[in-house]
Amino acid sequence: MKQHLWPLFLEAVKRDVVPALGCTEPISVALAAAIAIDELGIKNQASNVKLDVKIDVAVSANLMKNGMGVGIPGTGMVGLPIAAAIGAIAGDRHAGLEVLKSIKDSDVQAAKLMLANELVTVGVADVANILYAKVTVYYQQQTASVTIADSHTKVIAIEKNGEQCLLESQAKTTNDNSCKANPFTEAKLQDIYDFAMQAPLDDIRFIMQAKTLNDALSIEGLSGNYGLKIGATLVKNQAKGLLSGGLLTEVLARTAGASDARMDGAMMPAMSNSGSGNQGIAATMPVVACAEFLKSSETQTIRALMLSHLTAIYIKSYQNKLSALCGATTASMGAAAGITYLLDGELEQISAAICSMIGDVSGIICDGAKASCAMKVSSSAGSAVKSALMAIDGIRVTGTEGIVADDVDQTICNLATLANGAMTQTDVQILEIMLHK
């Protein structure tokens, strides 16, 4: 047992499972804009000088893809231009992924006026970074630019009036912790399982915050008018008798409801995973719904949620930060692990469930963040339940089928090889289609 990894596992979860208000790609643009205008010293008067401010945004292709069609919290609009404008006018540079938590209606109106006067431009930067956003703010004779790269809150450069205020070599001094030691270069799923099952309960109880935040988002999504209303549609048709109740329907509806609200800009934070609110929802809500359906104890729920989130982080650690592979699918593999545990499965069954999921949903593409992501989230949640139930019955996708190997860790590596290799060209094709349709 590799107990020396346990403190690193805790660090990884506390780093990667954090509250986030709004889709994290446009939020990184809003954060950069908030920092840039703050550097110019006009933050408190930004809404009054809005027509004297111009903003230029340059982002990586992947960030453009994920920012084009997703709702920005509190604005009723989608896309990177409104994210940059509202971030500059009312963003809190110290709030990280919750940069927009304090915006008011008057701020939104000011941001919309900036867009109407064509004061915000957005383009694709020719950079190697998969996650990259540079925001430059112009005010009178002053300029300030802020660059975020590689992680959603990692500021690597700040420049004011042509002078560097922060260089990439100093980036470790920001509030981003992405440079921490990576325990997953040594870890296997066995180690993740051992930690989730045996770590002192008080050390991992904090993971219940994921349940609190994402369940509240689910309730909001099921009761409000958000996105494609996938969760609400499932609940409505269950009441009509067109769908039966039970574990699967409960998991699908509650998970989709949270994603509906998230992707349509609800002013409520999600507990994220690996820099994504949807991935946090996918790793949380299927486990929560299953635990409540099975009447699992609080201890079981805590361990299931920790197993789910840490497994999701482990699988994602092999992949690029952003890719053409839908992140909700990999996060839901964590949920499959958590559900299998709640159904009294052990490591063998958990491994089987993950392998079956990779055999099922590994081809789902990411074509940007948007309302329909809730469909992919619910589909992946359904696969998690299906794979868990199969595993409990001793059934799994075998090592003779497709990219699935007999060994779960090798199968996870195979999935990453696909995502980081051939699917990079898929990503290029997806963005080309999106920009020219």
UniProtKB/Swiss-Prot annotation:
<dbReference type="InterPro" id="IPR021144">
    <property type="entry name" value="UPF0597"/>
</dbReference>
<protein>
    <recommendedName>
        <fullName>UPF0597 protein Shal_0864</fullName>
    </recommendedName>
</protein>
<dbReference type="GO" id="GO:0019450">
    <property type="term" value="P:L-cysteine catabolic process to pyruvate"/>
</dbReference>
<comment type="similarity">
    <text>Belongs to the UPF0597 family.</text>
</comment>
<dbReference type="Pfam" id="PF03313">
    <property type="entry name" value="SDH_alpha"/>
</dbReference>
<dbReference type="InterPro" id="IPR005130">
    <property type="entry name" value="Ser_deHydtase-like_asu"/>
</dbReference>
<dbReference type="GO" id="GO:0080146">
    <property type="term" value="F:L-cysteine desulfhydrase activity"/>
</dbReference>
